[in-house]
Amino acid sequence: MRTFLALELPGETAMQIADWRDRQFGHVGRPVPPANFHLTLAFIGELSESALERLCLTTEAWLADGEPPGGEILLDCTGYWPKPGIYWLGPNKWPETLSQLAGKLRHLTTAVGARRDRNAFRPHVTLFRNCSTAPPVTAPAISWQYRHFTLFESRQGKTGVSYHPLQHWELTPQNN
């Protein structure tokens, strides 16, 4: 099973991003469907069902010691990674607690046999794949609150990739 841990975007936030993207861009690559928008915390890749069960158990044990906090993210910058051809929207700055959450989840995934992700954590929402160049555009300012994270399975189908939630974990509500 090909899996990853991520923050889900609320439906209205995903549609807001898709509307902005679709108004700004022509054909610069393959657009990611709004239903697939997410912010990856830890890429797991292929892992057996028994290893995924261990991951769920260790995650629940870690959370039993106290849920990490949720938070708010302002998506206010765009970026481009030429090697994979990814054009993305992300935060210019993000809460340290988000980096800590991603770091802990990456540690838990490698502890159950997932390959260690050597890339630095850079929160982002992928807008386009197979993008040959970074389009010059001013980023919007779209904020959203994250209150849980999700274990997703990635499935390849006739119409492309789809992501299916397998497990959700709550985060402590942010104090405002």
Where are these regions (language model features)?
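Histidine-dependent nucleotide/RNA phosphoesterase domain, centered on the 2H-phosphoesterase fold
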Residues: 1-176
